[in-house]
Every structure is written in structure tokens, then in C-alpha cells.
């Protein structure tokens, strides 16, 4: 009988790693299928060489059964095209968008309305992939992204420089912390400035130091869990005349310099994973 019990324990121990490996393989296959989907805008897919969605989302440990909030999806829903289908069956993907009526009247409000309308149209065009995408509108000076403690992962791609420039970054990181479950993940990708760059230069260039982003997160209560080189670009010197917008995809430069900046590619980016400590 003792031998039988020991054997059962050994079998259970052996099955646990195998089961974990099987789940990881299934998640990877589902992510690959979402990245390869023919519903993606070809222009978006062509930028995978710069944005590395597989490596990035794997590093952030996003799985198909999670509740995930992406903050102000860029590029007409660049990551929405991947995360919407990936999370459709077992998880929940929420695109958090600025409420146009909470934006300043005029160009700002008009721009946010167009941004929202364009994303809605994109989602409506492919219901088989995007019919379960949730939208949450928020006020930029009072951001709130979910019920407290309800989200597994919050993701933000190339947004933090906007909040730093607008003086609202601390509000956003606190809202991320509030939305996440204890043990939840905050994934941040951001244009990376050279260490020691002063705040005014960061605001003008769109590049932020890792030190600043880490401080914003840890001041809000997060713990830095890991860094990834997935979106690093050593060709980017981060000192361009028109800041990060000099580079693709914005390409704010003289036409004769196009080849130079195309050879550099998109910006050098930090990829940081933070965790909300378990209570």
C-alpha cells in the first residue's frame, strides 16, 4: 500500500510539469494564430519586425483566459487585432479609450472622437474576431479602467510619454494599480531615452528614461518584475531633431533623409513587466 501511494505521488508530480508545458504550447499556438490572422491590416503586420508581438506578449505572460485591459490602443488598434481574437473565447479584452466628451473642446475632442469612431468601425468590420471586444471610456484627468481588483493584466504601448508631457502620469499608474488583481501584471513598452536625460528633453523628444518609468510604477505600489530586450533597437540614438516622431512610422523628416531613418527603423524601446504585490 505504501508503494502504491508513493507511486501515485510520483505520477502526479511527473504530470504537473507535462501539463504546464502542454498549456504553454497551446497558448503559444493560439497567439501565433492571432498574429498570423488575415484580419490584420497588412500595414500593421509589416511592423511586426519592429514591435515583436509574440515575444512581447509572451514576456508579459498574457494567456487566453485572462481579463486584459489595453490603454488607448494605438495604430488603429494595432494590438487589438491580435489580443481581441486571442482572448475572445476564454478571456476578456478591453480597449480603454479617452471619452471624447471629457477631452478639451475643439481639436482635442474632435481627434479623440475620430480615434474612437475609427476603432469602432474596425471592430464592426470583422465581428468573427472582434465582436467580444469591450470598450471602456475614461476621463484623461480622472482615469479609471475597471472595477477595483478585477483585471489580470494591464498593457500600455508607447503611451507614457504623452502622460508625462501632460502631467497626468501618476494618475494613470495609480489607476492601473487599482484595476489589477493582487499579483496582476502591468506591461509597459515605451520609447527609451539615454540615462540622465532631463525631464524637459524627455517631454520634447517623446523618449523617457527607464529610471523615470520605473519610478512612476514603483511610486504607485508596483514591483519591477523583469525587463526584456524584445523591443530594443541599438541603431536608434534617441537624439533626432524631431524626437521620436522623426522615425517610422511618423517619419517627420526631410524627404532626402528617408533612407537614413528607414535603415534605423522604429525607436529603441524599453519593455518592462511590473507586478502588483499579492496582499
Model-derived regions, located:
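Bacterial signal peptide processing site
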Residues: 6-8
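Conserved beta-strand signature within the Rossmann-like core of class I S-adenosyl-L-methionine
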Residues: 94-96, 183-192
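C-terminal motif of bacterial Sec signal peptides marking the signal peptidase cleavage site
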Residues: 2-4
